[in-house]
């Protein structure tokens, strides 16, 4: 039993155990326990667990000290104490009632008023009542009065606490107390004592079948789920009162203009966050927009070709803009552009040959923007026109030859035009440009036929020509001959070759940089193939010889022609057995060897097969490699 004296200081004493059977009865303070019998042993049981090797500390409350198994006051007088019990799980000191001892206690205060507890024992059913009918006198310093004050404080704490603790009706008589719990007197009914919110009941002390507990408690009667269930039910009731998303949609203002229905809520009020894919299709669904209300002023996102008011970009396929018109023809145009973009993957470029001249610059730009949807996006793309006003006012740019040539020949390997190379323009070319020249007559040439590229497999054989090695690997990989020099060739319509030195082409490029307002700069075409160090600058020469429009080198194996009449003139290598003509001698040699001749110079080293072309041999060697021959 824990009692409090008038002294507020706590004096710590050494752990002294004395085996004196006689206890001195001298008044040393306000309350001194006096043993009324003389045949009681001064030693009491001390039950310690095997896992706990730390002895119970000794504290002095007022002039009384608490130790296991003896207590001494301030004068080191041994006083019989209550039995202490320490468990290994929580190392808490368990205080048993002194009523279980078969001793008689005398309590005296400073006024010599004695109240005697005459050999009373509490019953095992925890009723908190004595067997005898002795009259009990309580003092202010008794634990009963202190417990009353503590209970009043707990009532105040319950009022201001956020969650009121619930009485546990299954508390046992011998509750294990933590150091933060208040001690109760042996006369107090423990069932009526409410647990404090600052109680430190450890979970292992409340669990049933505690192997380290030696107090003989019936822990099976404990119920730890009452408070948790009540708290869970209260929290669930709060969550059920939460307004769902369906009810929240009823209070949203109805715009009245958008007839799109809301998505049905099929999940709970708190959807799972793991189901989100963060996809754009969940937030933007332009195919579900309302198309019936043409007078709707609400801006919607559409994908249309840009007109003359926006800056054209090379190789751009679609350009999302914001418009007000939601009529059906725009969406028909969108479907047409999508189908046109998809048809571009079939590599059928014959439809570009039938382009007619438009009546205005704006319509020509629209036609160019529509045809640009069939091209792929370039690796290095820059705006073609930087200044719209200079484009509209400049007489040189009034002829849309440069735009049509750059848009219609971006990715077409067999088209009639290449990207414009303004770096090789000179002043005479720009000044002599005539507006009366019809640029779209050039577009009426038929597409090139029978154009075959040299594959890298030609390099497998030593019989391949030097031109084939030059076309596939570049000049850097072979030794150039003295006659092979860096020159800039001018290929005109009359099939005459004019050799322009490199210094003159460089001078024309420097002169072009001095006139930035006459033309727009175009980024060079970035190709995946290895570029040759020979600079080829084929230019288009018109019949009236008014000007020349240079074309950027295409970095490909064949040179395209423009005029159908001069189509065969650029193919000087004609086959003697048929009507086909070729631009390069190795192409003619390959044609004769594979079609008209039985020559098979490429033989397989693993079998007896021979081939007329090295690429066929390399394809055949793959079958041997698959079978594990090498």
Swiss-Prot record:
Residues 37-77, 115-137, 292-322, 360-379, 502-566 are annotated as: Disordered. It holds the Pfam family zf-C2H2. The keyword Transcription regulation applies. It is found in: Cytoplasm; Nucleus. Signal peptide: none annotated. The modification Phosphothreonine is found at residue 479. SMART domains: ZnF_C2H2. The modification N-acetylmethionine is found at residue 1. InterPro entries: Zinc_finger (IPR050331), Znf_C2H2_sf (IPR036236), Znf_C2H2_type (IPR013087). Its main location: cytoplasm. The modification Phosphoserine is found at residues 178, 263, 316, 319, 558. A motif (9aaTAD) lies at residues 237-245. It comes from the Eukaryota. One of its GO terms (cellular component) is nucleus. Keywords: Acetylation, Activator, Cytoplasm, DNA-binding, Metal-binding, Nucleus, Phosphoprotein, Repeat, Transcription, Transcription regulation, Zinc, Zinc-finger. The 9aaTAD motif (residues 237 to 245) is a transactivation domain present in a large number of yeast and animal transcription factors. Positive transcriptional factor that acts as a component of the stress responsive system. Recognizes and binds to the stress response element (STRE) which is involved in the response to various forms of stress (heat, oxidative, osmotic, etc.). Involved in the regulation of the CTT1, DDR2, HSP12 genes. This is Zinc finger protein MSN4. The gene is MSN4.
């Amino acid at each position: 039993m824990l009692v409090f004296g008038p002294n507020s200081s706590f004096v710590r004493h050494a752990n002294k155990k004395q085996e004196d059977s006689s206890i001195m009865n001298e008044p040393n303070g306000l309350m001194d326990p006096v043993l009324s019998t003389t045949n009681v042993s001064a030693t009491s049981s001390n039950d310690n667990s095997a896992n706990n090797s730390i002895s119970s500390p000794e504290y002095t409350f007022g002039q009384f000290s608490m130790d296991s198994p003896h207590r001494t006051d301030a004068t080191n007088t041994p006083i019989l104490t209550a039995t202490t019990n320490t468990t290994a799980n929580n190392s808490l000191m368990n205080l048993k009632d002194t009523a279980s001892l078969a001793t008689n206690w005398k309590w005296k205060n400073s006024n010599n008023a004695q109240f005697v507890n005459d050999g009373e024992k509490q019953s095992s059913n925890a009723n908190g009542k004595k067997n005898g009918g002795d009259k009990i006198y309580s003092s202010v310093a008794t634990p009963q009065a202190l417990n009353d004050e503590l209970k009043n404080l707990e009532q105040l704490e319950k009022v201001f606490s956020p969650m009121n603790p619930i009485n546990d009706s299954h508390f046992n008589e011998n509750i294990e107390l933590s150091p933060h719990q208040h001690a109760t007197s042996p006369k107090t009914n423990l069932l009526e004592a409410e647990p404090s919110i600052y109680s430190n009941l450890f979970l292992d002390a409340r669990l049933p079948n505690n192997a380290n507990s030696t107090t003989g408690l019936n822990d099976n009667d404990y119920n730890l789920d009452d408070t948790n269930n009540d708290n869970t039910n209260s929290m669930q009731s709060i969550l059920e009162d939460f307004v769902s998303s369906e009810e929240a949609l009823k209070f949203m203002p109805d715009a009245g203009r958008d007839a799109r229905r809301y998505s049905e809520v099929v999940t709970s009020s708190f959807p799972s966050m793991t189901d989100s894919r963060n996809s754009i299709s969940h937030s933007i669904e332009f195919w579900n927009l309302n198309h019936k209300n043409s007078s709707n002023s609400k801006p919607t996102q559409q994908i249309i070709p840009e007109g003359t008011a926006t800056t054209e970009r090379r190789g751009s396929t679609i350009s999302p803009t914001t418009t007000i018109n939601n009529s059906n023809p725009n969406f028909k145009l969108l479907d047409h552009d999508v189908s046109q973009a998809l048809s571009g993957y079939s590599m059928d470029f014959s439809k570009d040959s039938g382009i007619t001249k438009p009546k205005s610059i704006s319509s020509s730009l629209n036609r160019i923007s529509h045809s640009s949807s069939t091209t792929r996006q370039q690796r290095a793309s820059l705006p073609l026109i930087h200044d719209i006003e200079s484009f509209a006012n400049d007489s040189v740019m009034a002829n849309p030859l440069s735009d049509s040539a750059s848009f219609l020949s971006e990715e077409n390997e067999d088209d009639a035009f290449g990207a414009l190379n303004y770096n090789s323009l000179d002043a005479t070319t720009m000044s002599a440009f005539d507006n009366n020249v019809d640029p779209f007559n050039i577009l009426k040439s038929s597409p090139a036929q029978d154009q075959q590229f040299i594959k890298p497999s030609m390099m497998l054989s030593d019989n391949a020509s030097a031109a084939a090695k030059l076309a596939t690997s570049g000049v850097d990989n072979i030794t150039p001959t003295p006659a092979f020099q860096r020159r800039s060739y001018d290929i005109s319509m009359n099939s005459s070759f004019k050799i322009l030195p490199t210094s003159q082409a460089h001078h024309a490029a420097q002169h072009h940089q001095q006139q930035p307002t006459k033309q727009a700069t175009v980024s060079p075409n970035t190709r995946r193939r290895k570029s040759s160090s020979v600079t080829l600058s084929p230019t288009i020469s018109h019949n009236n010889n008014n000007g020349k429009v240079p074309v950027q080198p295409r970095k490909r194996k064949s040179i395209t022609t423009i005029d159908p009449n001069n189509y065969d003139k650029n193919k000087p290598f004609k086959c003697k057995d048929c009507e086909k003509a070729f631009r390069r001698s190795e192409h003619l040699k390959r044609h004769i060897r594979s079609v008209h001749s039985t020559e098979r110079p490429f033989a397989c080293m693993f079998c007896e097969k021979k081939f007329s072309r090295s690429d066929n041999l390399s394809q055949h060697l793959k079958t041997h490699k698959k079978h594990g021959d090498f």
